[in-house]
Amino acid sequence: QGLFFLDGVMYESTGQYGESTFRKVDLATGKAVKRLDFDKKYFLEGSVELKGNIFILTWLNKVAFVYDAKTLTYKSTWRYPREGWGLTTDGKSLIASDGSARLYFMDEQFKQQKVLTVKMNGRPVQMLNELEWIDGKIWANVYMTDMIVIINPADGNVEGTVDCSGLLPKSLRDADTDVLNGIAYNPKDGRIYLTGKCWKRLYEVRLVER
């Protein structure tokens, strides 16, 4: 549900009721170095680090959690006013999606600062899900599709798209395999990683312009 890098280390939040976790992951093996398990009533969604804290959204629980980024110790729980989907940051604000065409900019207490409507060719882009801030742009995967849109954070206009169809071969798909749903950028080396719900692989990708 959430995927991001902090100091060259990958972190991941996973969903489903009774299965939701937050994990610090060894990129080489894919195994959890440290793992937080959540009560079965919670369905975790997007997560991100901002100013020394890790923020984690829930889908329908209307709460968000804050943990210390260094120790992964619990700090606080906040009321959250909408469905939690994706979460990223520009280094100043939290930026969240809720499955609509809107992105919500918030402070660290989840107080709304502004709302951005994302449009492509003048039309709102619905079902924005997982988010990642990459080189001054917001990348968002469009839920239930293999498309990522690259968004100008100033005006909400889509400036490009990434076609991820064919990323996961049929040989690695099974009954549990779900949609594209993971974008992570490692600012230390500029690498971009993509994955999906219940995928058995994490892919390092490079864009080819078409």
Please provide the spans of the model-predicted regions.
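Blade-loop segments of beta-propeller domains
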Residues: 29-66, 72-84
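Short loop/turn segments that connect beta-strands within beta-propeller blades
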Residues: 25-30, 68-72, 107-111, 152-156, ...
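Conserved beta-strand positions in repeat-built beta-propeller and related beta-rich domains
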Residues: 11-16, 54-61, 96-100, 140-144, ...
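Surface loop/turn motifs at the tips and blade-to-blade linkers of beta-strand repeat domains
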Residues: 35-40, 76-82, 116-123, 162-166, ...
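Short coil/turn segments that connect the beta-strands within blades of beta-propeller domains
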Residues: 7-8, 51-53, 91-92, 135-136, ...
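Hydrophobic, well-structured mid-protein blocks that either form specific transmembrane helices
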Residues: 64-121
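Beta-strand-rich domains and repeat architectures in extracellular enzymes and scaffolds
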Residues: 1-21, 36-48, 85-86, 196-198
